């Protein structure tokens, strides 16, 4: 079997993209939080956001994925 059709990345125009292929929005959100903390330690701000990669094409999150992201934000420790 091949790769999953959809995975998630964190990416920004200045800080660039993480090198991970997150299987879930929750994992991508934890990666984003890590980048935010790292940027703060460097005295800057993270410009990354979570994007979906669907069959090799980067796209914005759709409604059900935005709901998953909202849930991840509310339940993050």
Region annotations inferred by a language model:
Residues 36-77:
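Short, mixed-charge low-complexity intrinsically disordered segments
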Residues 7-8, 27-29, 71:
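Sequence-level detector for tyrosine residue identity
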Residues 1, 28-43:
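Short linear motifs in intrinsically disordered
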Residues 14-30, 63:
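A short, exposed loop/beta-hairpin motif centered on an aromatic-Gly-Thr core
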Residues 1-18, 45-56:
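Short aromatic-glycine-(Arg/Gly/Cys) micro-motifs in beta-strand/loop hairpins
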Residues 4, 13, 34, 75-77:
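Extended, non-core accessory segments
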């Amino acid at each position: 079997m091949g790769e999953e059709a959809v995975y998630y990345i964190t990416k920004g125009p200045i800080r660039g993209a993480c090198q991970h292929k997150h299987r879930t929005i929750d994992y991508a959100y934890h990666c984003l939080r890590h980048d935010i903390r790292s940027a703060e330690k460097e005295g800057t701000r993270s410009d990354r956001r979570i994007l979906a990669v669907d069959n090799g094409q980067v796209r914005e999150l759709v409604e059900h994925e935005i709901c998953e992201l909202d849930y991840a934000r509310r339940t993050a420790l």
